[in-house]
Amino acid sequence: MEKLLDEIYDSVPQGGAQSDGAESANFNLYSFDDTGNAQRFFNLFGGEMIYNHIDKMWLYWDGKRWHADLDKETYRRAAISVEEMRKELEFYQNQDDSDGTENAKNFSKHIKYTRSMKGEKALIEMAQQLLPVLPSQLDRHIMAFNTASGIISLKTGELTPHNPKWFITKISEVEYSAGNNYSCPRWLKFLDEIFNGDKDLIHYVQKAVGYSLTGKTSEQCAFFLFGTGNNGKSTFLDVVRDIAGEYAMNIQPETIMIRTATAAANSDIARLKGARLVTSVEPNEGVRINEGLLKQLTGEDTVTARKLYGNEFEFKPEFKLWMATNHKPIIRGTDTGIWRRIHMIPFTVSIPEEKKDKQLKDKLEREYPDILRWAVEGCLLWQREGLEMPRAVREMCKEYRREMDVISAFIDDRCEVAEKSFAKASQLYAAYVTWCDENNEHKFSNTKFGVEMAKRFEKKRTMDGWFYVGIKLLQ
């Protein structure tokens, strides 16, 4: 991997500040125009500035990561480049011949032009051509996690110094020190409280959080945190999001629900490129998950997205979705393809108001460095053990799937399953439609209903039409 990173870094043009002794030898290489200005800028900042032509954005190395220039750092450095041109002017002024005098006169005029808005803008635009970088060259190492202390290898837990060659653009501001030991007693007590002492569940959650620090999506799952209020799930999610830092993003729950504004949804998805942990909180009751989109986002396939007013682009999702909810989002699909992706984590403990720790958030923040070590240890455990659901999660998922199975609910309520019974398909569907209307349930089409019933019962054709064998309508 290090060799690959060296090759990528070497492919990006590098400049660098000149030494005092080399200045006079290089001054004659610069032209008195925009191209020369760009070359001056390049030689000063070529190792610290890059330009992403696809996203049309400058990035600068701040000592820890490549930072998107949202605060006009490029213009500040352009101003420094112009100030450095005074040394070049002095070089020409110190020449005794007529060429030196003429050059000094012309260069003085050129400096005045370069200081103008037009000249400064031209300098920056020309420099873009000298310092190109592709989006594919950024954040390539999905098992590296950048922190205030250095880069964590999520394969080993070891820490290495910050390095521009890694082309990392994100960071968690949490400090980290390598080692197997961590001390976060209030965090561990909090987990014990909200998960009711279920050690298997806590062990699973530690691995899930650690897995979510990586850019891998091999588990192909989303985490739903379910429970009524006052159970700690929001606090839990806040802590996980905080230690993930810039690797975490939040989305409105509507992004992954069925809705008509597909353009807005696609723009929301475009924001998630490069994120590793995506959180969402409290979808409205009765909303339905966009199952096709959820499958796509939790898989390992390429996604097509488009920023608002921008062009389409493709990327592979690296994020894991964590959604906290008091209401179970509606899932109409009955296939394993959707249900195997849902990991519903139960939050069954309700914490009374009088027992709430008002200082809990502050106490947990003081433990962030060790909570990060706890999460990295979870990542190492995940790589050794996998992410098999514990009993509490399996049972919650099973209950969730049963609740979402409208046809099974209809059969339980209006039918009798018996080996030698039979029911006419048209009558069964009519009864199903009536039952859905009475219970305010979503109705499948006749075709979809037939497909689902055929999974459960044998279907035969007679002179009187189609019948299902092994079921009858209750009178």
Where are these regions (language model features)?
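Feature primarily recognizes SF3-like P-loop helicase cores of small DNA viruses
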Residues: Q14-M57, M85-Q475
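N-terminal acidic, proline/glycine-rich, low-complexity intrinsically disordered segments
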Residues: M1-Q14
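Trp- and S/T/G-rich repeat-edge/linker motifs of beta-rich repeat architectures
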Residues: M57-Y60, R65-A78
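Acidic, aromatic-enriched beta-alpha/helix-loop junctions
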Residues: K72-E90
